[in-house]
């Protein structure tokens, strides 16, 4: 669940480190022929985060999670779609490493080689999070690591290479991805549409996926 925001301390603002400025137009417009798969990517990220938390808990590196959960919430008034998980979360340093540093030594060559087959890019580089920008004009990520003494942080980006990273508030470990939808992508604040996508892409994922508190997927 997303907690109410208060005044936050700015930790950093800067530019996402990318090898080519072509990557954002590709992600925003042509990563997939069908924009709807952003939901699959974000839910899959949440499932991965839950698995990582379970593995880390075995070694005592972080707190345990009793049952993994992906929650999806719609705010029609704010035109937002939020995907939340109770996975391992991230520290500010991990956000900088995994979210800001979209940089790979072979990125430019790969983009050039596969620019007409852009579906491949997400899977090859693990850029599933950035599929958010196919439907959102602004993306906020609120995350808190399951490691002891961790401070929650809020990362925000408007689809350009610029970002802000602030101290945030989140009661429990996990991550919220808040999509501020573009005006021509408002189909994704329709409950029926989201329910259909959960059934299509997430039915047999190994954790519960709920919409407004109602479990939707069948699970394994």
What does each model-found stretch correspond to?
Residues 1-188, 196:
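GHKL (Bergerat-fold) ATPase N-terminal catalytic module, capturing the glycine-rich phosphate-binding loop
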Residues 12, 192, 206-208, 212-220:
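GHKL/Histidine-kinase-like ATPase module
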Residues 20, 197, 210-214:
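Membrane-protein biogenesis/insertion across secretory and organellar systems
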Residues 36-37, 108, 204-207, 211:
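Intrinsically disordered or highly flexible coil/loop and linker segments, enriched in small
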Residues 185, 191-204, 209:
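Juxtamembrane extramembrane loops of integral membrane proteins
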């Amino acid at each position: 669940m997303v907690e109410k925001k208060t005044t936050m301390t700015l930790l950093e603002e800067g530019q996402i480190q990318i090898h080519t400025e072509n990557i954002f137009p590709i992600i925003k417009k042509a990563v997939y022929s069908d924009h709807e798969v952003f939901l699959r990517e974000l839910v899959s990220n949440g499932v991965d985060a839950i698995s990582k938390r379970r593995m880390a808990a075995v070694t005592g590196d972080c707190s345990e999670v009793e049952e993994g959960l992906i929650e999806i919430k719609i705010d029609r008034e704010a035109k937002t779609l939020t995907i939340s998980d109770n996975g391992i979360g991230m520290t500010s340093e991990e956000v900088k490493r995994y979210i800001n540093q979209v940089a790979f030594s072979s990125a430019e060559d790969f983009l050039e080689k596969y620019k007409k087959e852009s579906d491949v890019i997400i899977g090859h580089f693990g850029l599933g999070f950035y599929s958010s920008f196919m439907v959102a004009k602004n993306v906020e990520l609120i995350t808190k690591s399951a490691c002891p003494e961790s401070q929650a942080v809020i990362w925000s980006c408007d689809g350009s290479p610029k970002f802000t990273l602030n101290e945030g508030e989140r009661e429990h470990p996990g991550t919220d991805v808040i999509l501020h939808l573009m005006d021509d992508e408002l189909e994704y604040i329709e409950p029926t549409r989201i329910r259909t996508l959960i059934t299509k892409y997430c039915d047999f994922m190994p954790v519960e996926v709920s919409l407004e508190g109602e479990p939707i997927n069948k699970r394994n």
